[in-house]
């Protein structure tokens, strides 16, 4: 039995979003008792079931962990990879945060997002009064900068055209699965996971390829404690994006960790490497 299986009781549930769709989420409640709440948003094409390494790492930290399957992902409703307004992710996330606060009897939560999920939680935090719900913000592999080669330049130009003309048209995201982790078992599991998909709508692809300026503008508005981390060899979301956003943060309590040699999913790297990643994350969590 794994660490997380011993440490938590697990619940599954759904809620209806503003558009009538069913949004799936999981709750992991520590058997030793809960002190705090963490809400986790996954990356593009994946789902909430891929975060057991995180659950292991914080098993003794007293967090009830809520993990969402974003619309169009995992077990939630919606065409795979299709969204026509990024703010729909914000609305669904807000609903889950409100559910977590109400169920756990807390006023504030810690919010963590990876990759596309990092973009969701980062941009969400800078909107309206959303920071009032947060103790802290954590981002993994914030995807506001991508490789700038000729193929990507063409995709960016075509994506903008298609996003306006055919926003729900799905195209292959072109993700090189070998670049998610050095751990071959992680890559193999990703490829064989029936809940993982590789298609992205023209609108969503265009948004993620062109959200750099929005993210930098948002950074100045973020005042809550924030921990950002990124693999320096990430070829999917370039680590300089996290650096640029970090430098513009309005928060006086901010930390950025860059990990030499690591790929996109640093929390799913080889056991030795991810141990280092989680040691730094847990050390920061312990202070917040």
Region annotations inferred by a language model:
Residues 1-32:
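N-terminal cap/lid segment of alpha/beta-hydrolase-fold proteins
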Residues 42-46, 232:
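Active-site glycine-rich loops that stabilize anionic/oxyanionic intermediates
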Residues 45-48, 74-108, 271-276:
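Catalytic nucleophile-loop/oxyanion-hole region of alpha/beta-hydrolase
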Residues 48-50, 55-79:
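Conserved alpha/beta-hydrolase
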Residues 116-201:
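Alpha/beta-hydrolase-fold enzymes
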Residues 222, 228-230, 234:
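Short beta-strand/loop motif that positions the catalytic acidic residue
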Residues 224, 238-247:
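Short alpha-helix in the alpha/beta-hydrolase fold that links the catalytic acid
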Residues 255-288:
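Catalytic active-site module of serine/aspartate enzymes centered on a nucleophile-bearing elbow/loop
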């Amino acid at each position: 039995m794994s660490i997380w299986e011993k440490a938590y009781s697990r619940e599954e549930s759904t809620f209806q979003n503003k558009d009538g769709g069913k949004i799936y989420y999981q709750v992991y409640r520590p058997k030793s008792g809960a002190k705090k709440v963490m809400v986790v948003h996954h990356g593009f094409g994946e789902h909430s079931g891929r975060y057991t390494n995180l659950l292991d790492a914080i098993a003794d930290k007293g967090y009830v962990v809520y993990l969402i399957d974003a619309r169009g992902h995992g077990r939630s409703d919606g065409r795979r990879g299709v969204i026509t307004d990024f703010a729909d992710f914000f609305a669904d996330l807000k609903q889950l945060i409100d559910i977590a606060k109400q169920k756990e009897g807390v006023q504030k939560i810690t919010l963590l997002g990876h990759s596309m999920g990092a973009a969701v939680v980062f941009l969400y935090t800078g909107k309206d009064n959303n920071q009032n719900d947060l103790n802290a913000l954590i981002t993994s592999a914030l995807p506001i900068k991508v490789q700038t080669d000729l193929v990507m330049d063409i995709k960016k130009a075509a994506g903008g055209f298609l996003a306006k003309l055919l926003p729900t048209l799905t195209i292959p995201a072109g993700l090189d699965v070998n670049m998610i982790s050095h751990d071959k078992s992680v890559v193999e599991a990703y490829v064989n996971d029936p809940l993982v998909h590789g298609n992205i709508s023209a609108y969503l692809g265009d948004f993620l390829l062109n959200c750099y300026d929005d993210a930098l503008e948002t950074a100045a508005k973020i005042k809550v404690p924030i921990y950002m981390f990124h693999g320096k060899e990430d070829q999917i979301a370039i680590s300089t994006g996290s650096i640029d956003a970090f430098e513009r943060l309005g928060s006086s309590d901010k930390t950025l960790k860059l990990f030499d040699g690591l790929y996109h999913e640093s929390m799913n790297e080889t056991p030795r490497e991810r141990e280092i990643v989680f040691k730094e994350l847990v050390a920061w969590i312990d202070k917040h």
